[in-house]
Amino acid sequence: IVYGINHKGMDVEETDIFSAASCTTNAISPVLKVIEDNLGVVKGHIETVHAYTNDQNLLDNMHKKPRRGRSAAINMVITSTGAGKAVTKVIPSLKDKLTANAVRVPTPNGSLAIMNLTVSKGTSVDEVNNCLRKSALEGDLINQINYNINEELVSNDIIGNTCCAVFDSNATIVSPDKKNIVLYVWYDNEFGYTKQVIRLAKYVAQVRRLIYY
């Protein structure tokens, strides 16, 4: 379940275990939802540049995934990610359209998803950015997508962001034939993801904040 996208489709009363997916799945799903709804995704690849995690070794040692056995704090490590498959459970129309991989890097927090997508409708940088800007400002994804215009944006800047996806609008690329787009989405893989888990937990527990204005 990615809160903001498919949480309303679950039966809270009849479900015993809820999965809030992963930090990467929560980061890419809102943006992919916007692109799929507005431009149509034909196929694509997702590469996540991810802060190292406690699944890796601090010193070279044994690991069931050999590369993850190498020292996390001094190496860039190519590894797998389940986000490419998980996102198709959140957005079923993307099934069999995406591949995904990861590079773990020696930063303690702050990650980046790079999405290279072929779309069915010809587009432009302005159109892509406008679609995501609108979704970040109105609708069901205002707590999920942060539309960022900072030209100096780097990974440290997004730490502590409450949105699960920080869209880097200045990095958007569209190919000359207008059918291939590259999107850069930052995310705080700790705090930003935790906020999504809390949103889902509140929904399941039927905790509501009443706002009067």
Stretch-by-stretch model annotation:
Residues 1-69, 175-177, 199-200, 208-211:
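N-terminal Rossmann-like NAD(P) cofactor-binding subdomain of oxidoreductases
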Residues 40-181:
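C-terminal substrate-binding/catalytic lobe of Rossmann-fold NAD(P)-dependent oxidoreductases
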Residues 30, 127, 195-196:
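Generic recognition of short, well-ordered alpha-helical segments
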Residues 23, 79, 120, 188-189:
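Structured loop/turn residues at secondary-structure junctions
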Residues 26, 122-123, 191-192:
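A generic structural signal for alpha-helix starts
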